Amino acid sequence: MTFDLKTEEGLLSYLTKHLSLDVAPNGVKRLSGGFVNVTWRVGLNAPYHGHTSIILKHAQPHLSSDIDFKIGVERSAYEYQALKIVSANSSLLGSSDIRVSVPEGLHYDVVNNALIMQDVGTMKTLLDYVTAKPPISAEIASLVGSQIGAFIARLHNLGRENKDKDDFKFFSGNIVGRTTADQLYQTIIPNAAKYGIDDPILPIVVKELVEEVMNSEETLIMADLWSGNILLQFDENSTELTRIWLVDWELCKYGPPSLDMGYFLGDCFLVARFQDQLVGTSMRQAYLKSYARNVKEPINYAKATAGIGAHLVMWTDFMKWGNDEEREEFVKKGVEAFHEANEDNRNGEITSILVKEASRT
């Protein structure tokens, strides 16, 4: 039986009649934001798997802002499995000094494209904090970078060590995760063209990036590791960072670790250039140092540089930070990163930064 989970009436019918949940009066609230899902917060009179407040995500087959950008609804199955895998391996991914968590996955309904998970509470994203005036302190930014770096390195270790196990092999089938990355890479050439950049390396790089993301089985990657998917939880005095939540695991798949590197570090470069140089730089340096200390395989600096370049070209225009001239300058920096990666130039601007900062272990 299917329900219209885009409406409150349909949602209530689904929760009460299909799942037999005791929903609190006025307990349903639609959450804003999100590119591809209709998301609800639901308060309950009686606990569901130990929780009296839950989040329900209803997958849509296209971007909220662009119905022509198609994205398969089966992605929710991969998010649910990712949450289960990370939770089951929390002792390997973290330790007493790691504050990174994911919400608990509670239920997945393939018929209604519904994913129910733990409600971790209302909090701001890392993106909110780095764009605030004033932004978070450099000390907090450094802590975030260090924590995320350690967690992602251990995720990459875990993926490499378990790729032959069925519950990990499952992620190789995330075609949505692969094709979404392909669609994003296809924006590189037109994004560069907006700023009058027509470099013969662009189609070569796009082809290489697409081929790799469509075929790589190197390790398990989060694949959407940017500041909008990182929630920061502080203590009641708003002074101590107590927990970092990584959310939106729909694109989790087997693929190149450079994709995770490119997303997070590319975000750090954007923040440093357009928001706060010290915050962005501190976060980047801490991430690289922590990632290098925890990862068991050598970092491929050329691929990481290409991933950062892709992020800069794909997202500089989208974020609309700075003026046209400043954005053009930064898109050019992304294109130059492609040349660095293609030549494996350790003395290039971005590559030299990566090598230097990752070696500070």
Curated annotation (Swiss-Prot):
Residues annotated as binding ATP: N37, K57, Q118, D119, V120, D248, W249, E250
Annotated metabolic or biological route of this protein: Secondary metabolite biosynthesis
EC number per UniProt: 2.7.1.-, 2.7.1.222
Listed cofactors: Mg(2+)
Biotech uses: The pharmaceutical interesting psilocybin as a treatment option against depression and anxiety is being investigated in advanced clinical trials.
Domain of life: Eukaryota
Keyword tags: ATP-binding, Kinase, Magnesium, Nucleotide-binding, Transferase
Cysteine-cysteine disulfides: none
Molecular function (Gene Ontology), one example: ATP binding
UniProt cross-references to Pfam families, sorted A to Z: EcKL (PF02958)
Transmembrane recorded as keyword: no
Catalytic reaction equation(s): 4-hydroxytryptamine + ATP = norbaeocystin + ADP + H(+); psilocin + ATP = psilocybin + ADP + H(+); 4-hydroxy-N,N,N-trimethyltryptamine + ATP = aeruginascin + ADP + H(+)
InterPro entries given in the database record: EcKL, Kinase-like_dom_sf
UniProt GO BP: psilocybin biosynthetic process
Active-site residue list: D224
Enzyme class: transferase
Family, as annotated: Belongs to the methylthioribose kinase family.
Annotated function: 4-hydroxytryptamine kinase; part of the gene cluster that mediates the biosynthesis of psilocybin, a psychotropic tryptamine-derived natural product. The first step in the pathway is the decarboxylation of L-tryptophan to tryptamine by the decarboxylase psiD. PsiD does not decarboxylate phenylalanine, tyrosine, or 5-hydroxy- L -tryptophan (5-HTP). 4-hydroxy-L-tryptophan is accepted as substrate by psiD as well. The cytochrome P450 monooxygenase psiH then converts tryptamine to 4-hydroxytryptamine.
Subunit structure: Monomer.
Protein name per UniProt: 4-hydroxytryptamine kinase
